[in-house]
């Protein structure tokens, strides 16, 4: 199993990043809350990974630290929650925000996440609350959220950031029409792709 990658960031195409380690390029799917904190292109990054093997694909999911990965691994154990939905959940909320929402039983906040209906939200609260008791670390005893950094350079800006941002939202589980509407609501000329995605997800909550 691939549990950790250390290498150079070659490409960023939310929510995927291409990282080269020892001459091999790895495509890694990351929650947007983790994606925002990646270094610039051509710089070194360390990513903790979870490897998923399916009949039709082998996928790597990446995180900035072990606690975020542990949360993802617990999420995909919940009935009805697969890796794609877990990725969408942790893109719509930071790991700390999600833990807080579950602890406070904020069903209304959870159902605003893509792919999460009332039944799934209720299941998340019931099952994840118990799972948190077996996990250690500051993340699982949240006090307040940590502001996210979202570095962006001219290299990482897309020629059409609005289209790229909408495509990223679709990859996270939003319908194309809904994704376009979300981006159009917060679009502004100077915003890059990562900023548009972050603002659209925040506005949806």
From Swiss-Prot:
It holds the Pfam family HHH_5. One of its GO terms (molecular function) is four-way junction helicase activity. Residues 157-205 are annotated as: Domain III. The keyword Cytoplasm applies. Residues 143-156 are annotated as: Flexible linker. SMART domains: HhH1 (SM00278). It comes from the Bacteria. InterPro entries: DNA_helicase_Holl-junc_RuvA_I, Hlx-hairpin-Hlx_DNA-bd_motif, NA-bd_OB-fold, RuvA, RuvA_2-like, RuvA_C, RuvA_C_sf. It is found in: Cytoplasm. CDD domains: UBA_RuvA_C. Keywords: Cytoplasm, DNA damage, DNA recombination, DNA repair, DNA-binding. Residues 65-142 are annotated as: Domain II. Residues 1-64 are annotated as: Domain I. GO terms for cellular component: cytoplasm; Holliday junction helicase complex; Holliday junction resolvase complex. The keyword DNA-binding applies. GO terms for biological process: DNA recombination; DNA repair. The RuvA-RuvB-RuvC complex processes Holliday junction (HJ) DNA during genetic recombination and DNA repair, while the RuvA-RuvB complex plays an important role in the rescue of blocked DNA replication forks via replication fork reversal (RFR). RuvA specifically binds to HJ cruciform DNA, conferring on it an open structure. The RuvB hexamer acts as an ATP-dependent pump, pulling dsDNA into and through the RuvAB complex. HJ branch migration allows RuvC to scan DNA until it finds its consensus sequence, where it cleaves and resolves the cruciform DNA. Homotetramer. Forms an RuvA(8)-RuvB(12)-Holliday junction (HJ) complex. HJ DNA is sandwiched between 2 RuvA tetramers; dsDNA enters through RuvA and exits via RuvB. An RuvB hexamer assembles on each DNA strand where it exits the tetramer. Each RuvB hexamer is contacted by two RuvA subunits (via domain III) on 2 adjacent RuvB subunits; this complex drives branch migration. In the full resolvosome a probable DNA-RuvA(4)-RuvB(12)-RuvC(2) complex forms which resolves the HJ. Has three domains with a flexible linker between the domains II and III and assumes an 'L' shape. Domain III is highly mobile and contacts RuvB. Belongs to the RuvA family. This is Holliday junction branch migration complex subunit RuvA. It comes from Pectobacterium carotovorum subsp. carotovorum (strain PC1). The gene is ruvA.
């Amino acid at each position: 199993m691939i549990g950790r990658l250390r290498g150079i960031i070659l490409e960023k195409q939310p929510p995927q990043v291409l990282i080269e380690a020892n001459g091999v390029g790895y495509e890694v799917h990351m929650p947007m809350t983790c994606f925002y904190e990646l270094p610039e292109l051509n710089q070194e990054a360390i990513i903790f990974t979870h490897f998923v093997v399916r009949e039709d694909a082998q996928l790597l999911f990446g995180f900035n630290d072990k606690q975020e990965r542990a949360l993802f691994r617990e999420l995909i154990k919940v009935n009805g929650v697969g890796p794609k939905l877990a990725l969408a959940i942790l893109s719509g909320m930071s790991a700390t925000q999600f833990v807080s929402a579950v602890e406070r039983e904020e069903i209304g906040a959870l159902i605003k996440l893509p792919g999460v209906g009332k039944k799934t939200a209720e299941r998340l609260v019931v099952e994840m609350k118990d799972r948190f008791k077996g996990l250690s670390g500051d993340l699982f005893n949240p006090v307040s959220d940590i502001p996210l950094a979202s570095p962006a350079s001219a290299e990482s800006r897309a020629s059409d950031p609005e289209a790229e941002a909408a495509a990223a939202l679709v990859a996270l589980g939003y319908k194309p029409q809904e994704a376009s509407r979300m981006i159009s609501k917060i679009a502004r000329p100077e915003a890059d792709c990562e900023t548009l995605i972050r603002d659209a997800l925040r506005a949806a909550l």
